[in-house]
From Swiss-Prot:
Described purpose of this protein according to its UniProt entry: Catalyzes the condensation of (S)-aspartate-beta-semialdehyde [(S)-ASA] and pyruvate to 4-hydroxy-tetrahydrodipicolinate (HTPA).
Family as reported in the entry's similarity comment: Belongs to the DapA family.
Record keywords: Amino-acid biosynthesis, Cytoplasm, Diaminopimelate biosynthesis, Lyase, Lysine biosynthesis, Schiff base
Name listed for the protein in its UniProt record: 4-hydroxy-tetrahydrodipicolinate synthase 1
Annotated localization: Cytoplasm
Pathway it works in: Amino-acid biosynthesis; L-lysine biosynthesis via DAP pathway; (S)-tetrahydrodipicolinate from L-aspartate: step 3/4
Keyword Cell inner membrane set for record: no
Annotated organism of origin: Streptomyces coelicolor (strain ATCC BAA-471 / A3(2) / M145)
Subunit and interaction comment: Homotetramer; dimer of dimers.
Substrates-to-products reaction catalysed: L-aspartate 4-semialdehyde + pyruvate = (2S,4S)-4-hydroxy-2,3,4,5-tetrahydrodipicolinate + H2O + H(+)
Length: 305
């Protein structure tokens, strides 16, 4: 399900969903369905599957397709499903894009090819080839801290002319570059870093793709709702209130995949272990995450009292 709103083609509130595994490390499709249903019921317009948080480097092609199929069965047309298909290999990325389309995805998340560090003209050609290969809309994924390659703003502007390149997941930490693209294209920008959700929304972003939303899907939806209602003070308060949990999950030295799964597991929700080379969080880390979560829950309860 994509929306009729060109400014937010996949909705506003998206979760970068973890990929649940069983205790032995096998794909847990039942857990994925239960988690997806919970996220959508609590305010997510869309789910990004097999992204960074979804451990895409360590899931097989068959697992990626099976995950899309299972989650589609769980959420029906209540949410947009954006499938992560980006790899370091253009041919492989095209294969994954076609498989995701067949499995029922609504869109594709395509990260810049990593490790080989292609120049901008090669990067542009890569994205065009992937976008040409299927009928699904594409969300570019700019996360140079992980890929080693920036999708430069001028490259994004050129790619915006492609009819199926409709959005960007922005993890570049370049506010000027983001504004440059927003001012020159109709691309929908999605904040890919939880601490930047309100700042980017305030300058015209479509919404967000959040890792923290795995645990608190209502939180950042409330930020956007307050801003849309004209209550910018409350929007800012809610964004600041999230800082301890965002810091614990995203800025404490561990990948968000690890912390999200640890906290979900501690709360009795589907998650399971991470796959190697990642390692699951230890008890001390999990206790700290629970403390930050409890603080946020207490603050929310007081504000509603």
């Amino acid at each position: 399900m994509t929306t009729d709103d060109d400014s937010a083609p996949f909705g506003r509130s998206l979760c970068a969903m973890v990929t649940p595994f069983t205790g032995s490390g096998a794909l847990d499709l039942d857990g994925a369905q239960r988690l997806a249903d919970r996220l959508v019921a609590r305010g997510c317009d869309g789910l990004v599957l097999s992204g960074t948080t979804g451990e895409s480097p360590t899931t097989t092609d068959a697992e990626k397709a099976a995950l899309v199929t299972a989650v589609r069965e769980a959420v029906g047309d209540r949410a947009a499903l954006v499938a992560g298909v980006g790899t370091a290999d253009t041919r492989h990325t095209v294969e994954l894009a076609l498989a995701a389309e067949k499995a029922g995805a609504d869109g594709l998340l395509v990260v810049a090819p990593y490790y080989s560090r292609p120049p901008q003209d090669a990067l542009e050609a890569h994205f065009r080839e992937v976008a040409d290969a299927s009928g699904l809309p594409v969300m570019l994924y700019d996360i140079p801290g992980r890929t080693g390659t920036r999708i430069e703003p001028d490259t994004v502007v050129r790619l915006a002319a492609h009819p199926r390149i409709v959005a960007v997941k922005d993890c570049a930490y370049d506010l000027l570059g983001t504004q440059k693209v927003l001012s020159r294209t109709g691309l929908a920008y999605y904040a890919g870093c939880d601490e930047q959700i309100l700042p980017l929304y305030a300058i015209g972003a479509a919404g967000y793709v959040s890792t923290v939303a795995n645990v608190v899907p209502e939180l950042f939806r409330a930020v956007l709702d307050a801003f849309d209602a004209g209550d910018t003070g409350r929007a800012a308060l809610l964004q600041r209130r999230a800082v301890p949990l965002v810091e614990s999950m995203m800025a404490a030295g561990l990948p968000g995949t690890v912390t999200a799964k640890a906290l979900l597991g501690a709360l009795g929700l589907p998650a399971g272990p991470v796959r190697a080379p990642l390692r699951s969080a230890d008890r001390e880390t999990t206790a700290g995450l629970l403390a930050a979560y409890g603080e946020l829950a207490a603050d929310a309860g007081q504000s509603q009292a």
